[in-house]
Design a protein with these regions (language model features):
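Cytoplasm-proximal transmembrane signaling helix
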Residues: 282-315
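Intrinsic low-complexity, intrinsically disordered coil/linker regions enriched in small/polar
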Residues: 208-283
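Extreme N-terminal signal-anchor transmembrane helix of membrane signaling/transducer proteins, especially
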Residues: 1-43, 47, 51, 308, ...
Length: 315
């Protein structure tokens, strides 16, 4: 093949040979120039999207922190309510409570606790469960132990702490929205002798805690991953589970927010990570920028083709 090209070149007239040599020497700097220009354009596209994803993650960090504080503060308020603790302790120890005491507790304390929850739009519910069924239920605040056992998290060996993505089963499935997913902080309530007298479930919806997991934004996807490796989010992730695990393994825990560019599975992604230590997990957001990067490649190819055509015409 090389010999045939050599003979074909030697058979050409001198002016054609001269033109071909000029075209060849001009193609090299044009190719280098195109490579540099469009490489810089590609890096600019990547940098812009990395800045966007970092900004989005910073907003998510502030929003999640606000919601965690809201749940923690509400839980502490319930834990410091002496009247509530007194009723839980009475139920735990079998101490009789008169009807008048129950009515006073309901009108003065339960109503104020209910208003506290109702006036906080971030919260879904705050429920207090006794350690047995020897308590007069006062909805939507105080419940018996048997009611708590209907919740999914109550079946765990250790359910204290954060529980994610469960349905509210405290009442009949006919009366509760089974499509509503809940996240809650479950906290033990102990008396002065550190004996258990109850449990507090402070809950909000998953969509409220992690709105990015449920937003329908083109070419963007998010999930929350616990330290146990459990994924919560849209199940239609735009890439394989293996790639997602590789992305998580690449996370730099030294930084609060880490944003990286990833090329995998013939596609281009910008991945932003954030460790949420209070929840014992990590928030991950992915943007598919394949189309934007390929536009740069297409422009580069068109530029090179046009320049070559111009050289041939001029020659």
């Amino acid at each position: 093949m090389a010999a045939q090209l050599k003979r074909a070149f030697q058979n050409q007239k001198l002016n054609i040979k001269f033109t071909l040599v000029i075209i060849l020497f001009m193609m090299v700097p044009i190719g280098i120039l195109a490579g540099v220009i469009f490489y810089l354009m590609e890096q600019n596209v990547i940098a812009e999207n990395k800045d966007y994803m970092k900004y989005t993650m910073e907003r998510s960090r502030d929003a999640v922190a606000t919601k965690i504080d809201s749940i923690n503060m509400t839980t502490q308020f319930f834990l410091s309510d002496e009247a509530l603790l007194g009723m839980l302790e009475a139920a735990a120890k079998g101490t009789p409570v008169t009807t008048e005491e129950w009515l006073t507790f309901k009108s003065e304390k339960v109503s104020s606790l209910e208003r506290l929850v109702y006036n906080n739009p971030l919260l879904y519910a705050v429920r207090v469960y006794a350690v047995n069924d020897s308590v007069q239920e006062m909805m939507p605040v105080l419940y018996r132990q048997s009611r708590m056992k209907k919740q999914e998290w109550a079946g765990k060996e250790n359910y204290f702490g954060w529980n994610f993505d469960y349905t509210d089963n405290i009442f009949s499935s006919y009366t509760m929205d089974q499509n509503l997913r809940i996240v809650s902080l479950v906290t033990p309530v102990n008396d002065e002798e550190n004996e258990p007298i109850g449990t507090i479930e402070a809950a909000m919806t998953m969509e409220n805690m992690f709105p990015g997991l449920y937003e329908d934004i083109e070419d963007e996807w998010s999930c929350f991953v616990t330290e146990q490796g459990i994924f919560y989010g849209n199940e239609t992730e735009p890439f394989s589970k293996e790639l997602l695990e590789q992305m998580i393994d690449a996370y730099d825990d030294a930084e609060e927010i880490s944003t990286v560019y990833v090329r995998a599975e013939k596609r281009n992604f910008v991945v932003s990570y954030m460790r949420v230590r209070e929840l014992g997990g990590m928030l991950l957001s992915v943007e598919d920028i394949t189309e934007n990067v390929h536009k740069v490649y297409f422009m580069r190819n068109v530029f090179v083709a046009v320049m070559i055509a111009l050289l041939i015409v001029i020659g």
